[in-house]
Design a protein with these regions (language model features):
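Extracellular/periplasmic, surface-exposed regions of secreted and cell-surface proteins
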Residues: 133, 204, 210-219, 224-229, ...
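Outer-membrane beta-barrel proteins
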Residues: 27-31, 37-80, 102-108, 155-172, ...
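Conserved small-residue
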Residues: 90-149, 581, 598-687, 718-782
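Short beta-strands and strand-coil junctions in structured, solvent-facing domains, enriched
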Residues: 22-24, 59-64, 81-84, 97-100, ...
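Single conserved hydrophobic/aromatic residue that forms the stacking wall/gate
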Residues: 1-8, 12
Length: 884
């Protein structure tokens, strides 16, 4: 796991499609202050074009695909023209309907909006997101922001009506033809989605053409081109973005109906209708979806060509070239009078990413007696050329025309990302007697992003396996397959470009009309950077029993990364935000187990049951000199962060803890009745999973099959700022404790005419803890406090009550399929199948309240932090597949 990675680097497994790396860049994701998920590259791959997927694990895969694959490779092979028929047509259609999966369930319906147990006068605007008012009373009437007087009653599930039923349709047509040694396959897919959020939709159209042929049995040619067009309207803002509709709705008082906001989001002049005291961080979600719109368009071109010359039966030479070119435009608009953007704003982001990959290989295979051997030598050129331009326009003067010309103030920022890696590599493969195998590789990369002297690095690998079932001639009925394997690999990796020296850019400001330039670096250049080094070792055992009806695959691995390239924060007086250094050491150890079984097999019925399990320990052994922690991501409030902490597992959640005595009891301030917290930040949890697992099952009876996929993740923690908000605003059920007693005490105080400072409360919330006595001993705390004051204090001081074990068990998918019998359709069709599909239908177990446990800022450094999560979706639908 790297301590630092850029948006252009991939900390996950590398995707390779038909031998060509995929540009899986994410153009945007949520963070501390919000953001948008702008998608990635792999989502553009058409599932109907995929023939197979396989995984090359760990750094051993880097020998083939370079340092970009240091975390493994997902190999995707796409379909060619079918050789079964000279001409074939396939139609595939899927329609699903989406509904909310997660809802706000832990909600109290005893008290409504307001503060201090009261609702002030008839004006509700300043408490619409607070649930600390009086008890529900149908006899109490309030005049709301829209001028309508309504009774003070609970509106159950008051935010659910905001979400609608979504729908997704995907239609694919495939045409393929084969003649002699030539095949052509063409695919067109149309996908359209109407999201559960109002006024939100997307479409994606994909055209794929692949042709392959053999000339004179000597030359193999394989060409493929794919074009994808994607359009999205109103991607939802995430996390703490002011336009995040989920964040703005989740604390809405239970006596407040969201549909009032729908009917009154703007006034007669088209201006923002103030409903909550013009809170710039809690906007009317209907204004957001209609007047703070965004839209994006993306064009993706992928092309590849393979030319292979078969010199003779032993030697072949091949060249593969590929390109992945992406053009994306994202436009975000805020109409005038939008809180925070009163004069209006338009921001247009233009991304132009180009990735090129060329590979040449000479492959020789032969045998001598019982030996089989092969030698491969080759070279690779990998080049990235990305450009970004962001235009921000402010002060709108022509409100009816959403275009740059309608704004008087414009600012342009541009960015360039270019890098190139040239590689040479070779491999030797030996086999003896079909039971002993030995492979060795050596690869050298020359990176443009590292300094001279350190920009060329070698990394070797060696692996071996012993097929003992073949060597010992074990009874094939009992043990048809048994193999042990071992491997060792070393891999180096580079960093982003422009880290070695100063770079410059045009300043958005000018002097007397003349353009100014400025230093573009925000990180102190480091001309002595070295490549990161990772050493890994792996042992494995593969077994198959009882005529292959039981299969077991066990892997133990260890991996140590050193010379990590770390980005450390610097003081503002340096003129930079950070500096890059080589430091740090992280050690991974883990096991992976896969069990594949067929418990039942008869003539008409079979049952397949597959189970997988993985456990990983990711220990931070060492950081830099004098550095004990390295921040990965920070939360919005109270100095909570996810970090790499020396001596701890990667992904520690740090924050202030309750101050405790030696017995572990919470120490309470005797004067206020509120708990004390530590001055320093402490490890309160960890964002990484202790273990993960999955279960797939498939029942087949003749032409009917029923399959299900279960997902299990255990042991990670998450700091839920949504829960923090729910407690702070009095919406959670747990905030009921002490309210009745405190409000009764306050009535007694008011009747007695005593000031609050001179009154000893007779009821309220009592913190479970101790107070320190003058002699240093501790006594039980018995002081009553206002529950509203208590939860506001907790929300502002410590994250401890809002850090949850994020373990869960989910049903990811259920499919019921029926394949029509041949005798019914053979005169017209080759095959027809119909299926019922349920995706993410329900969560069997989760511990975190109200939200989906998969909710995080993002899937990278933001794991372990959550705020304002949109409800996850469950979908039900059907699929029809017809082959001619």
């Amino acid at each position: 796991t790297p301590l630092y990675s850029s948006a252009a680097s991939d900390v996950y497994k590398r995707q390779v499609v038909d031998g060509v790396p995929l540009d899986n860049s994410n153009y945007g994701s949520a963070g501390q202050y919000g953001g948008y998920d702008l998608g990635d590259g792999i989502s553009s791959i058409n599932p109907d074009d995929i023939e197979s997927m396989s995984v090359l694990k760990g750094p051993a895969a880097s020998a083939l695909y370079g340092s970009r694959a240091s975390h493994g490779v997902i190999l995707i092979t796409t379909k060619k023209a079918s050789t079964k028929k000279k001409f074939a047509v396939e139609l595939n259609s899927t329609t699903t309907f989406e509904k909310q999966l997660t809802k706000w369930d832990d909600v109290q319906y005893v008290y409504g909006q307001g503060t201090g147990g009261r609702i002030n006068g008839t004006d509700d605007q300043y408490s619409s997101n607070k649930n600390w008012g009086p008890k529900i009373d149908p006899g109490l009437n309030l005049t709301y922001f829209d001028g309508v007087t309504r009774p003070y009653v609970v509106i159950p599930n008051n935010i659910d009506g905001f979400f609608r039923t979504g729908m997704t349709t995907t239609n694919t047509i495939v045409v393929s033809t084969v003649k002699d040694d030539t095949g052509i396959r063409a695919t067109y897919t149309d996908m359209r989605n109407k999201d559960i959020l109002p006024n939100t939709k997307m479409s994606r159209n994909t055209l794929n053409l692949r042709a392959n042929t053999t000339i004179n049995k000597k030359v193999d040619l394989d060409f493929k081109v794919t074009y994808t067009r994607e359009d999205v309207k109103n991607r939802p803002a995430l996390s703490d973005h002011r336009a995040n509709p989920a964040k703005n709705l989740m604390s809405l008082a239970t006596t407040y109906d969201q549909k009032w906001l729908r009917d009154n989001y703007k006034d007669a002049d088209g201006n923002y209708y103030d409903w909550n005291g013009r809170d710039v961080w809690n906007l009317n979600p209907y204004w957001v979806l209609n007047e703070m719109t965004n839209e994006s368009g993306k064009d993706k071109f992928m092309g590849s060509a393979l030319v292979r010359y078969n010199v003779n039966e032993h030697l072949k030479i091949q060249v593969t070239g590929g390109a992945d070119i992406n053009f994306m435009n994202f436009q975000e608009y805020a109409a005038p009078t939008s809180p925070g953007f009163e004069q209006g704003q338009l921001q247009i982001s233009d991304f132009r990413n180009r990735m090129y990959n060329v590979e040449a290989l000479a492959i020789y295979n032969n045998s001598y007696k019982k030996f089989d051997y092969g030698v491969t030598i080759g070279g690779n050129l990998y080049k990235v050329d990305n450009k970004t331009q962001i235009v921000t326009a402010k002060e709108m003067v022509m409100r009816d025309v959403i275009a740059l010309q309608s704004f008087t103030s414009k600012e342009i920022t541009e960015g360039t990302y270019r890098k190139q890696i040239n590689s040479l590599y070779g491999s030797i493969n030996l086999a003896y007697g079909n039971f002993v195998y030995l492979d060795a590789t050596l690869r050298g990369d020359h990176s443009s992003t590292l300094p001279s002297g350190n920009n060329t690095y070698l990394y070797p690998s060696v692996s071996g396996s012993f097929l003992f079932s073949e060597f010992f001639k074990i009874n094939p009925t009992l043990l048809p397959y048994g193999k042990v394997r071992v491997s060792w690999a070393q891999v180096g990796s580079d960093t982003d470009p422009y880290q070695l020296g100063l770079s410059y850019e045009l300043s958005p400001k000018n002097y007397s009309g003349y353009a100014l330039s400025q230093i573009a670096n925000t990180t102190i250049p480091n001309k002595d950077l070295k490549p990161t080094k990772t050493n890994s070792a792996e042992v494995g055992l593969e077994l198959k029993f009882l005529k292959n009806r039981i299969g077991l695959d066990f892997t133990y691995y260890t991996q140590k990364s050193s010379n990590q390239i770390m980005r450390l924060n610097t003081t503002g007086t340096s003129g930079y935000n950070s500096m890059l250094i080589n430091a740090g050491e992280i050690e991974n150890k883990g096991v992976e187990i896969a069990l594949n079984t067929r418990p039942i097999q008869t003539k008409d019925f079979s049952w397949d049951l597959n189970i997988n399990f993985s456990k990983n320990s990711n220990k931070v052994k060492r950081l830099a000199s004098g550095i004990k922690e390295f921040e990965l991501e920070s939360a919005r409030w109270i100095n909570v962060k996810v970090a790499a902490v020396e001596g701890e597992n990667y992904g520690s959640i740090l924050g202030k803890d309750f101050l405790r005595n030696d017995a572990g009891q919470i120490i309470v301030d005797a004067s206020t009745g509120l708990p004390k917290v530590t001055e320093d930040l402490r490890v309160l949890g960890n964002a990484t999973w202790k273990w993960t697992g999955g279960i797939t099952t498939n029942l087949t009876y003749r032409d009917i099959s029923l399959s299900a996929i279960f997902d299990i993740k255990v042991g990670a923690d998450v700091y839920s700022m949504s829960a923090r908000s729910s407690y702070m605003t009095g919406k959670d059920k747990a905030t009921l404790a002490g309210r009745d007693g405190w409000y009764e005490s306050e009535e007694q105080r008011l009747q007695a005419g005593v000031k609050e400072s001179n009154w000893e409360a007779t009821g309220g919330y009592v913190v479970e803890g101790v107070v320190e006595m003058p002699d240093g001993s501790f006594a039980e705390n018995k002081k009553f406090v206002d529950p509203e004051v208590y939860w506001k204090h907790i929300a502002d001081q410590t994250p401890v009550p809002f850090i949850y074990d994020n373990s869960y068990v989910k049903v990811r998918e259920i499919t019921l399929a029926y394949r029509l019998p041949k005798r019914w359709i053979s005169k017209v069709f080759d095959a027809v199948s119909v299926s019922f599909v349920a995706r993410n239908p329900f969560i069997i177990y989760k511990n975190v309240p109200n939200i989906d446990p998969d909710s995080n800022y993002n899937n990278g450094s933001g794991m372990g932090l959550e705020y304002g999560s949109l409800p996850s979706r469950r979908s039900y639908g059907f699929n029809v597949n017809v082959k001619f």
